[in-house]
């Protein structure tokens, strides 16, 4: 359905943008793009770990986020269109969930590497940026008619 696609695009745009901001924040501190070399950041940056967890759970379409509403609309529409799409969509959701959790666990958990001992804490602007990504997701989750009203 058009409303499901629109809802999912807006939710995906906010969640993906939050992921990219978090990845850039990690890169600015570690000067490294390899997830295995950036492990254990939860010990040094607990608030950043919270933002990673929030982005991961939002990406998993955790209820009651707007991501879940969009995915439910798209899944029900595609299932009524063709039964084979439900298998492909389910597989896609499983792979996305596994990768999101793998990325969170790899970056946040584990033992610290030796080059990350002297790391700067997150700036207020970075925390505000993450909040500015999360606020629309929460507001749209509380009142999805903001999106659905335009598409129905």
Curated annotation (Swiss-Prot):
<dbReference type="GO" id="GO:0031966">
    <property type="term" value="C:mitochondrial membrane"/>
</dbReference>
<keyword id="KW-0472">Membrane</keyword>
<keyword id="KW-0249">Electron transport</keyword>
<dbReference type="InterPro" id="IPR003918">
    <property type="entry name" value="NADH_UbQ_OxRdtase"/>
</dbReference>
<feature type="transmembrane region" description="Helical">
    <location>
        <begin position="128"/>
        <end position="148"/>
    </location>
</feature>
<keyword id="KW-0679">Respiratory chain</keyword>
<feature type="transmembrane region" description="Helical">
    <location>
        <begin position="2"/>
        <end position="22"/>
    </location>
</feature>
<protein>
    <recommendedName>
        <fullName>NADH-ubiquinone oxidoreductase chain 4</fullName>
        <ecNumber>7.1.1.2</ecNumber>
    </recommendedName>
</protein>
<dbReference type="GO" id="GO:0015990">
    <property type="term" value="P:electron transport coupled proton transport"/>
</dbReference>
<dbReference type="GO" id="GO:0048039">
    <property type="term" value="F:ubiquinone binding"/>
</dbReference>
<feature type="transmembrane region" description="Helical">
    <location>
        <begin position="84"/>
        <end position="104"/>
    </location>
</feature>
<dbReference type="Pfam" id="PF00361">
    <property type="entry name" value="Proton_antipo_M"/>
</dbReference>
<keyword id="KW-0830">Ubiquinone</keyword>
<dbReference type="GO" id="GO:0008137">
    <property type="term" value="F:NADH dehydrogenase (ubiquinone) activity"/>
</dbReference>
<keyword id="KW-0813">Transport</keyword>
<comment type="similarity">
    <text>Belongs to the complex I subunit 4 family.</text>
</comment>
<comment type="function">
    <text>Core subunit of the mitochondrial membrane respiratory chain NADH dehydrogenase (Complex I) that is believed to belong to the minimal assembly required for catalysis. Complex I functions in the transfer of electrons from NADH to the respiratory chain. The immediate electron acceptor for the enzyme is believed to be ubiquinone.</text>
</comment>
<keyword id="KW-1278">Translocase</keyword>
<keyword id="KW-0520">NAD</keyword>
<dbReference type="GO" id="GO:0042773">
    <property type="term" value="P:ATP synthesis coupled electron transport"/>
</dbReference>
<keyword id="KW-0812">Transmembrane</keyword>
<feature type="transmembrane region" description="Helical">
    <location>
        <begin position="43"/>
        <end position="63"/>
    </location>
</feature>
<keyword id="KW-0496">Mitochondrion</keyword>
<dbReference type="InterPro" id="IPR001750">
    <property type="entry name" value="ND/Mrp_TM"/>
</dbReference>
<keyword id="KW-1133">Transmembrane helix</keyword>
């Amino acid at each position: 359905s058009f409303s499901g696609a629109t809802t999912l695009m807006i939710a995906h745009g906010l969640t993906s943008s939050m992921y990219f901001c978090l990845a850039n924040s990690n890169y600015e501190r570690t000067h490294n793009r390899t997830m295995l070399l950036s492990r254990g950041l939860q010990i040094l940056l607990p608030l950043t770990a919270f933002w990673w967890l929030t982005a991961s759970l939002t990406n998993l379409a955790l209820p009651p986020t707007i991501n879940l509403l969009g995915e439910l609309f798209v899944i029900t529409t595609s299932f009524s269109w063709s039964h084979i799409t439900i298998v492909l969509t389910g597989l896609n959701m499983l792979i996305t969930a596994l990768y999101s959790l793998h990325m969170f666990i790899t970056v946040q958990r584990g033992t610290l590497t030796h080059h990350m001992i002297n790391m700067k804490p997150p700036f207020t602007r970075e925390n505000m940026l993450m909040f500015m990504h999360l606020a629309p997701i929460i507001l749209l989750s509380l009142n999805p008619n903001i999106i659905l009203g335009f598409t129905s």
